[in-house]
């Protein structure tokens, strides 16, 4: 099924030979996390599938660039189980049928092109390449470089929003964030602490500087002079306070005399007594 004129290989992730036929692999990871792939050689899609080579061969579907007439192999494609031809990949933006995913069964679908005849693909007779001729699909919903339809409802596999958030690693990180935060809080505490210590050091430096200034000041006779002034002032202030306290004592005494002498309230009590009688 692999001809010289169409040199795709199973793990060709480049776009040098036309559209990136494995563009969907990143969007719908097939059993291996992106983190696990870092630094490793890219796995062939057939090695990623739970069913191994048989499932891989059963799901192949020809996608060609413009120079090819027969091609192999294509990305594993997911298509709605019930695929009316009103929508580019089958299904309509309104009936939600594009959410039902299955491996393509090689029978062709008008959703992939106006004339998609039945062809057994890899299940063809031995000796024939059995690949289906590619018929360009109608343009509705397609965008470059690889035609993943736009306009599907949010939350479907075809939605540009949900591909990463709902099924990809970003979503997983979000859901396991409680664990993540615990670690972060610890680090935050450390940072806060170290900042605090830094501030303390700053304070120490400041106080040392302040002390030096004071030493320098004390040399000046002006400062001694002003200290004497302060002392005089404070003495005067004390005298004032003593005077104040004498005054206040006096006023308290006067108030007391008023009450202890003829009470202004005694008149009232006498009247009340009369009433009771």
Curated annotation (Swiss-Prot):
<protein>
    <recommendedName>
        <fullName>Knob-associated histidine-rich protein</fullName>
    </recommendedName>
</protein>
<feature type="compositionally biased region" description="Basic and acidic residues">
    <location>
        <begin position="169"/>
        <end position="190"/>
    </location>
</feature>
<dbReference type="GO" id="GO:0005576">
    <property type="term" value="C:extracellular region"/>
</dbReference>
<feature type="compositionally biased region" description="Basic residues">
    <location>
        <begin position="221"/>
        <end position="237"/>
    </location>
</feature>
<feature type="compositionally biased region" description="Basic and acidic residues">
    <location>
        <begin position="268"/>
        <end position="277"/>
    </location>
</feature>
<comment type="function">
    <text>KAHRP might mimick human histidine-rich glycoproteins to anchor host thrombospondin or a parasite analog in a binding complex with the endothelial cell receptor.</text>
</comment>
<feature type="compositionally biased region" description="Basic and acidic residues">
    <location>
        <begin position="238"/>
        <end position="259"/>
    </location>
</feature>
<keyword id="KW-0677">Repeat</keyword>
<keyword id="KW-0964">Secreted</keyword>
<keyword id="KW-0461">Malaria</keyword>
<feature type="region of interest" description="Disordered">
    <location>
        <begin position="95"/>
        <end position="114"/>
    </location>
</feature>
<feature type="region of interest" description="Disordered">
    <location>
        <begin position="162"/>
        <end position="277"/>
    </location>
</feature>
<feature type="compositionally biased region" description="Basic and acidic residues">
    <location>
        <begin position="211"/>
        <end position="220"/>
    </location>
</feature>
């Amino acid at each position: 099924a692999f001809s010289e004129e169409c040199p795709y290989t199973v793990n060709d992730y480049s776009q040098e030979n036309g559209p990136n036929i494995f563009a969907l692999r990143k969007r719908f990871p097939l059993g291996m996390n992106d983190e696990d792939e870092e630094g490793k050689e890219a796995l062939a899609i057939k090695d990623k599938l739970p069913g191994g080579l048989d499932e891989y061969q059963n799901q192949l579907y020809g996608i060609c660039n413009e120079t090819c007439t027969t091609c192999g192999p294509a990305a594993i494609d997911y298509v709605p189980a019930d695929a009316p031809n009103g929508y580019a990949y089958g299904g309509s933006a309104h009936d939600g049928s594009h959410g039902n995913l299955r491996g393509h069964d090689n029978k062709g679908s008008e959703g992939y092109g106006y004339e998609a005849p039945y062809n057994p693909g890899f299940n063809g007779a031995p000796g024939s390449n059995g690949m289906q001729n590619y018929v360009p699909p109608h343009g509705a919903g397609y965008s470059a470089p690889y035609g993943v339809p736009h306009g599907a409802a949010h939350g479907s596999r075809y939605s540009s929003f949900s591909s990463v958030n709902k099924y990809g690693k970003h979503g997983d990180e979000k859901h396991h964030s409680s664990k993540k935060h615990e670690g972060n809080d610890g680090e935050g505490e450390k940072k806060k602490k170290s900042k605090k210590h830094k501030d303390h050091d700053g304070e120490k430096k400041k106080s040392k500087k302040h002390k030096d200034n004071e030493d320098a000041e004390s040399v000046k006779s002006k400062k001694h002079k002003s200290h004497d002034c302060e002392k005089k002032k404070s003495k005067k202030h004390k005298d004032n306070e003593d005077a104040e306290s004498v005054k206040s004592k006096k006023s308290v005494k006067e108030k007391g005399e008023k009450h202890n002498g003829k009470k202004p309230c005694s008149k009232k009590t006498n009247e009340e007594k009369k009433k009771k009688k």
